Amino acid sequence: MPAWVVPSALELDDLYSVARSEYDAPRGNRPQACGIVGALMWVTGDARVGPVTGRPEQPVTAAVATAECWAARAMGHSSETPEWQLKAACTELGVAYWPPNVELIDPEEGYGVYQTLSWLLRWLDGYRGGSVPPLPLPQRHLDGSTVTADELGVGADQPASSAPSRAASAIA
C-alpha cells in the first residue's frame, strides 16, 4: 500500500468488498462501484493505468493520484473545470498532464474514482473534503471485528442503514 494512502488497509478492504457487492446487486450503482474498484486496483498496483486518464505511472504517488483525481472531478464538472486548470494542477504537482479519456470511462465511473481518490488522499478540495468514503463502510470494534446488527440494536423491523455512523459511535 502506498505510504500516502490515509485510510487503513482494513478500510480499503471494506470499501473494495462493499463496492463489489454494490456492483453485483441488481439495483446497485454499477458505474460508481466500477469507478471505486478501478481506483483501488490502480492505487494498489493491480491495474497498470489510471482509471480516468490511462496514465501509465506506477507506483502511484500522491501527486499522480491527485492529478488523476482532478481529471476524474473534471469528468463530472466539465464546465466548471476547464482544461487549462487541469494542466495548471499537473504543473503544480510536477506530473505530466493526461486529459480525462471519455472513451475509457463514463462520467459516473469517473465520479466513483473522484470520490475514492479524494478519500484515499484526504484531499480537502475533493469529495466531501476527503473525509468520507464513497460508500458506507461496516462499523468495527477497536480490535477490527465487525459490529453485529444485535450490537447496533438493529431489529428485524429496523434497516441496518439506520444504524449510527462511525462518527456517532466514536462520539458516544
Question: Which residue stretches match the model-derived regions?
Answer:
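Compositionally biased accessory segments in Actinobacterial proteins
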Residues: 1-172
